[in-house]
Design a protein with these regions (language model features):
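ATP-binding N-lobe of GHMP and related small-molecule kinases
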Residues: 2-161, 165-180
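Conserved small/polar residues in nucleotide/adenosyl-binding loops
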Residues: 183-189
Length: 191
């Protein structure tokens, strides 16, 4: 979707049903402002990108079994209305560039998806997800993305999992037409 079309739809209520499925009614106007701000920041960072895709991935609360999933146990989780949103433009430059609000931009070359000893954080997550899609036979050619999150890191509502879900959703929806289950995707990305 063109940036101006996205902004017009947000302003004129064209996405209100989508916002109503994600957020509480009293939060829709503030969320619309949040999305508009994210698109503006994306445009400032990547001024030559005009076709965008916008994604949301929720945080989660673990009701039972907290952290047992890290040892292949089971957990009962529920989504919360805090999320990370991403504005992305896909391209054929064979690189993923991501700028998250409050953090420096980083890049992951799709020509180098091997494990990097000592690499930690978001670039490690993105590299692992891209490697998993490659292992599944999905051709990825790259994208630029701006993210903003109200899922606070270290708060116990899975900010890293929300970021991972956001990236996997963007890749899966654009390059793979959504056929992969998240369980199938995320477990092997932990390398």
């Amino acid at each position: 979707m063109k940036i101006q079309d996205f902004q017009d739809n947000v302003t004129c209520g064209g996405f209100d049903n989508i916002f109503a499925n994600i957020y509480k009614p009293q939060d829709i106007e503030s969320q619309k402002s949040r999305y508009m701000s994210a698109v503006e920041k994306f445009t400032a960072l990547y001024p030559n990108r005009n076709d965008i895709h916008v994604y949301s991935a929720p945080g989660r609360t673990e009701i039972g079994g907290n952290h047992t999933d890290h040892q292949h146990g089971c957990v009962i989780a529920g989504a919360v209305d805090l999320d990370v949103i991403g504005v992305a433009a896909f391209h054929d430059e064979n690189i993923i560039r991501i700028k998250s609000e409050g953090y420096d931009e980083f890049a992951v070359s799709l020509d180098d998806l091997d494990v990097h000893i000592g690499e930690k954080g978001s670039s490690e997550i993105v590299r692992g997800i891209a490697a998993r899609f490659k292992d599944l036979g999905v051709e990825i050619s790259g994208f630029d993305m701006y993210t903003t999150s109200n899922v606070l890191g270290g708060s116990g509502i899975s900010s890293s999992a929300a970021f991972e879900t956001l990236i996997a959703t963007a890749i899966d929806s654009y390059y793979n037409n959504n056929p992969v289950s998240y369980t199938h995707l995320t477990l092997p990305t932990i390398r």
